[in-house]
Design a protein with these regions (language model features):
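Flexible loop/hinge segments that line or gate small-molecule binding clefts
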Residues: 140-177, 292-300, 304
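N-terminal helix-turn-helix DNA-binding module of bacterial transcription factors
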Residues: 1-64
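Hinge/cleft segment of the Venus flytrap/periplasmic-binding protein
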Residues: 46, 50, 206-207, 223, ...
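Amphipathic helical "hinge" segments at domain boundaries
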Residues: 54-114
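Hydrophobic alpha-helical segments within soluble ligand-binding/sensing domains
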Residues: 170-196, 245-246, 311-328
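Short helix-capping segments at alpha-helix termini
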Residues: 95-99, 151, 223-230, 277-283
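Hydrophobic alpha-helical
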Residues: 131-149, 233-294
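Hinge/beta->alpha junction and helix N-cap segments in small-molecule ligand-binding domains
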Residues: 74-83, 104-115, 172-178, 200-220, ...
Length: 358
């Protein structure tokens, strides 16, 4: 029987196929009342044949059971990476209502470790049935998940995966491989002996996110495999201090004349791009991550060589829906590690990119 037939099979159809009454099928499906062993065997055989699954969504609505999901994510402004992720949450929220599921969002400052510590303290006093966790601060997320395990609260990871945890699923790219992709995009455009600038946003209390560290590991690994003979130079930059960033980069590029490439491992490559455009440094190739508005504009203008994208809206949407299906239907995702495609965007194809594809 086809998948479409599976979804439309009715109790009356099962009764007809098993040669029993509708009432008998109802007693078996809902586990109420006695049924002869012969009829039970017939009905179970048909249920297996048609791959029947009871309508647990309708049952949940009828029972009045309410579920709450906690979505833990960085605070954002419109046009930033996490705004796209939030669009996926909003989209899933509309569908989650049919499961009697409501969503509560909890925000932290992704550039401030103490902000996440305070949020975890808040979450310990909250009651929720499942959680979507952005894993930027891996060293704090892992211990917190053990607390969720003890409470019997299922959770999914987004942004980057963490080993040694009991997550229901992960939705995101392979950060290591995404780093290798960026390295290839840059290395193929450089002489093997050229130097590379790595732009890093200054964090308060932490060296950077788990995802950025994994991307850098993949980046370095690829360069090493290719026999890269240049050097990596790190530029500690600030989010909203153009004068400071200009001074840092002027000094770095003046001291290291072999610099011909640049990369950032988060969504802020527009900072480096703005500097290169202002200084007319067309000799420096820049690769970054995420199709946010400012990055896309710099790519379209030819300042950015390439962007690596990871479909944040799909991550948010699928994370919420996986928890809904598990809580209400008892259905796990087909795979625990759900890697998004690693999309490569160039000036020639960015106008056709649909970042919101689920």
């Amino acid at each position: 029987m086809s998948d479409n037939e599976h979804t439309t099979v009715r109790i009356v159809d099962i009764a007809r196929m098993a040669g029993v009454s509708v009432a008998t099928v109802d007693r078996v499906i809902h586990n109420r009342g006695k049924v002869s062993e012969e009829n039970l065997a017939r009905i179970n055989e048909v249920l297996h044949e048609v791959n029947y699954r009871p309508n647990l969504i309708a049952r949940s609505l009828a029972s009045g059971r309410q579920y709450t999901l906690a979505v833990v994510m960085p605070r954002f402004a419109q046009g930033e990476y996490w705004a796209d992720f939030d669009a996926g949450i909003v989209r899933a929220e509309a569908e989650a209502r049919r499961y009697n599921v409501t969503i509560r969002k909890f925000f932290f400052d992704q550039y401030d470790r103490s902000s996440f510590e305070k949020l975890l303290a808040t979450l310990r006093g909250e009651t929720f049935d499942g959680a979507v966790l952005a894993t930027l601060f891996a060293e704090m997320v892992s211990p917190f998940t053990r607390e969720l395990d003890e409470r019997g609260v299922p959770y999914v990871f987004v942004d980057s995966n963490l080993p040694g945890c009991n997550q229901l699923a992960y939705f995101g790219t392979s950060s290591f491989d995404a780093g290798a992709v960026a390295a290839r995009l840059l290395y193929d455009r450089l002489d093997p002996g050229s130097d590379i600038v790595v732009g890093r946003i200054i964090h308060r209390g932490d060296a950077g996110s788990n995802q950025c560290r994994s991307r850098e590991e993949g980046f370095r690994s690829y360069l090493q495999q290719q026999g890269f003979r240049g050097k990596l130079h790190y530029a500690a930059l600030r989010l909203d201090d153009e004068a400071y960033n200009r001074e840092v980069l002027d000094d770095l590029l003046l001291k290291h004349r072999a610099i011909a490439g640049a990369v950032t491992f988060n969504s802020t490559c527009y900072i480096l791009a703005g500097y290169l455009a202002a200084r007319r440094r067309t000799d420096v190739r820049l690769v970054g991550y995420d199709v946010i508005r400012r990055n896309g504009q710099m790519l379209d203008e030819g300042v950015v060589t390439a962007l690596v994208a990871q479909r944040p809206e799909a991550q948010g949407y699928r994370g919420v829906m996986a928890l809904c299906e598990w809580l209400v239907e008892g259905r796990r995702p087909d795979t625990a590690e759900n890697n998004m495609p690693i999309d490569i965007l160039l000036k020639e194809n960015i106008r056709y990119y649909k970042n919101n594809l689920i």
